[in-house]
Curated annotation (Swiss-Prot):
Induction: Expressed at low levels at 37 degrees Celsius; 5-fold further induced after heat shock (50 degress Celsius). A longer form is transiently induced by diamide (at protein level). Autoregulated. Part of the sigH-rshA operon. It comes from Mycolicibacterium smegmatis (strain ATCC 700084 / mc(2)155). It holds the Pfam family Sigma70_r4_2. InterPro entries: RNA_pol_sigma-70-like, RNA_pol_sigma-70_dom, RNA_pol_sigma70_actinobac, RNA_pol_sigma70_ECF_CS, RNA_pol_sigma70_r2, RNA_pol_sigma70_r4_t2, RNA_pol_sigma_r2, RNA_pol_sigma_r3/r4-like. This is ECF RNA polymerase sigma factor SigH. GO terms for biological process: DNA-templated transcription initiation; response to stress.
Amino acid sequence: MTDVDRVEPETPPEREETDAELTARFERDAIPLLDQLYGGALRMTRNPADAEDLLQETMVKAYAGFRSFREGTNLKAWLYRILTNTYINSYRKKQRQPSEYPTDEITDWQLASNAEHSSTGLRSAEVEALEALPDTEIKAALQALPEEFRMAVYYADVEGFPYKEIAEIMETPIGTVMSRLHRGRRQLRDLLAGVARDRGFIRGPQLGEPEEVTS
């Protein structure tokens, strides 16, 4: 048998996905994540109108690049990365003023649950009083955090992303994510404690402030 006889037949190229198939796959996999993505957009823009615009632009970009997304990898993290980059590039500089939005759009009780533990991991009487706060107060405290802390807390404590995926979404080292999350949770806890004190749920100095010593 000659070398010519031993030549293997060429493997036929894989059939390219049609536009109809791409659309069906996008609707099946990406569209169900719209509500969660809107929550992230609202946390970034702090304005419902901007959040809707940001989400729409994100989904247009996601659809345009959906052929490059590898099935079996984390679609949610992929979409959040597009959302975050779109916000940074397009909306951060022209952001509208924050406005009120319905309190039932996003539930943030996970934030208080993660923020209400002391450095020893034990719940104190003060932080247990935070459970009396309504979700609107928790939302307001989260919005008061610096952006980099706010988004780290949101991705970890609301969306449940692990550090590695948050680092990919925010395009920062894992160590930076851990630092932002630690500082963000601590600031959130202090803010919530201050609100609880104003509401009469906590007595004494604010968390993080020294007790007054009398002679």
